[in-house]
Curated annotation (Swiss-Prot):
Residues 1-20 form a transit peptide. Residues 129-186 are mitochondrial intermembrane. CDD domains: Cyt_c_Oxidase_IV. The keyword Oxidoreductase applies. It comes from Schizosaccharomyces pombe (strain 972 / ATCC 24843) (Fission yeast). This is Cytochrome c oxidase polypeptide 5, mitochondrial. Component of the cytochrome c oxidase (complex IV, CIV), a multisubunit enzyme composed of a catalytic core of 3 subunits and seevral supernumerary subunits. The complex exists as a monomer or a dimer and forms supercomplexes (SCs) in the inner mitochondrial membrane with ubiquinol-cytochrome c oxidoreductase (cytochrome b-c1 complex, complex III, CIII). The chain crosses the membrane at residues 108-128. Residues 21-107 are mitochondrial matrix. It is a single-pass membrane protein. Pfam families: COX4. Its main location: mitochondrion. GO terms for cellular component: mitochondrial inner membrane; mitochondrion; respiratory chain complex IV. SUPFAM superfamilies: Mitochondrial cytochrome c oxidase subunit IV (SSF81406).
Amino acid sequence: MYLSKIICKKVPMKLLCTRNAATVSAAATNALQKEQPSGEAMIARPRLVDLDKRWGIMSQEEKDGLITDLYARQKQPWTTLSIEEKKAAYWIAFGEHGPRAFSHISQKTVFWGTVAGLTIGVVLFGLIRTQAAPSPRTMTREWQEKSNEYMKENKINPISGEASEGFKGRGQISGGIFSPSEKDKK
């Protein structure tokens, strides 16, 4: 009878102790990993798979733990990192989360922002143009035509310039977009 009481008490106690030991062991392992991540041990694959999809629902403690573990692993040679660890490290560094998260902007906002920017630019250009100094006298068409005649009379640049035989270019006449071209003269 005494033996049956011992067996009955010890068997459930062993089972209970085993369960407690497993729970305590798991909790201690998690605590150790959070306190001192070992850079030599690989990070468990389930923690890394589909990280981009799970990142938004992970708790801040999980994120911090994973970042710390990856940081410790990256101190080792990169040849020892698994492909999942490399992908996770890249995604944490450059993924679409936090300040790099994709923001949805409506097309109307973009359109009206562009219209407002162009309008402000045109108004500023007009205001600056009205306050600008007048163009110098050397920019008038008469002055530039006289400069061409002067260059022909004094044979300035006789090989390829205005004084050369058969010259058909504009010479000193400025060729802005509002200046008449050679076709308009004929």
